[in-house]
């Protein structure tokens, strides 16, 4: 019983991995209302040159629905807002959906239409996402761009008096020299040097003490080693 259960679990795992590997990939298109979806699906000339091609939509829990299909003598086919063009010489199916609406959002695919057989999927599936183009955004962007261009002139006008005024330039040096020549500043400088000298002296004492302690330890060790060699 254990072996059968183990084999069953392994088989289920193998099947799930196989389905995941064979799952078709999707390509996402994000467009706004009124725009046009333009998709080109390649196919093998030798195998599907004379076959019919179709554009399908896939809804959850339903079979793929054919929205438009080419005829055997290939000509541009239009069904509503969907236009299909089959280029036999290049092995290419050109799909266009004009004047997109939010309701057009969904999963689509190009297929080789060969009923009663299952359709052969061409290219990657198309995940179409259509959003509403808000009319307020262009107006807001237009109002914001003049403000951006107005800021540089205001900054340059504010900076020009600072560079051209002679008073600000002549007043700055006397203040700086007077501050440096005051005795208070000299006292502060001596205080700073005193503060710096104290830790240096302490560090010298610590270093000398370290050397003395190391020399004492070395002499003790040397005496012990000599004593050990003496019979």
Curated annotation (Swiss-Prot):
Glycans are attached at residues 188, 191. The chain crosses the membrane at residues 203-223. Residues 134-157, 164-182 have a biased composition (Polar residues). Residues 21-202 are extracellular. GO terms for cellular component: plasma membrane. Its main location: membrane. Residues 224-231 are cytoplasmic. InterPro entries: Ig-like_dom_sf, Ig-like_fold, Ig_sub, Ig_V-set. It is a single-pass type I membrane protein. Residues 26-131 form the Ig-like V-type domain. Residues 134-182 are annotated as: Disordered. Monomer. Homomultimer; when activated. Interacts with TYROBP/DAP12. Interacts with TLR4. This is Triggering receptor expressed on myeloid cells 1. It comes from Pongo abelii (Sumatran orangutan).
